Amino acid sequence: EYISALVKKDVELVPISKKNISCVSSYTHTVEFGKNPILIGERINPTGKKRFKEALKNNDIDYILKEGIAQQEKGVHILDVNVGLPEIDEEKMLKTAVCELQAIINLPLQIDTSNASAMETALRRYNGKAMVNSVNGKQESMDTVFPLVKKYGGLVVALTLDESGIPQKAEDRVSIAERILDEAAKYGI
């Protein structure tokens, strides 16, 4: 009787579900946007980092992993992963970096590349809902990035620049942002 009464009560309960939550996740952790500031670790990026560039050229994945661990220990919420260097196979290195980082850290990752093939390879192997860095107001960028974000899920960082570069006026930047949002909506993003 007791269990039957519980079942009847349970049927009457309506689950609470939040709508329109923006979040990214790893296989174990979720980071929700809109509540508190989000810290994104940007050290896994060769721009201006001679030692990091050498590590990439030498296929030194341990260097990347140490950077990831150090940033996690410092308290970042999301880890940006950028291995773009002309001298290496970015697609192969990004795939390796994403897979290896996921094996040792529990932070959500931000896939940071303008190489569509590398982006898709990384997103396909990512265990969670990734952040993609980035799309911009150029039609070519939106036509490349949005289908991948739609296919694999995730959030996307939008940069307010277009074929003419970065506008000087705030109104022009807002116009680009609106164009990006309109295009994203076509993909259900």
Question: Residues of each region from the PLM?
Answer:
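Domain-level signal for soluble alpha/beta catalytic cores
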Residues: 1-189
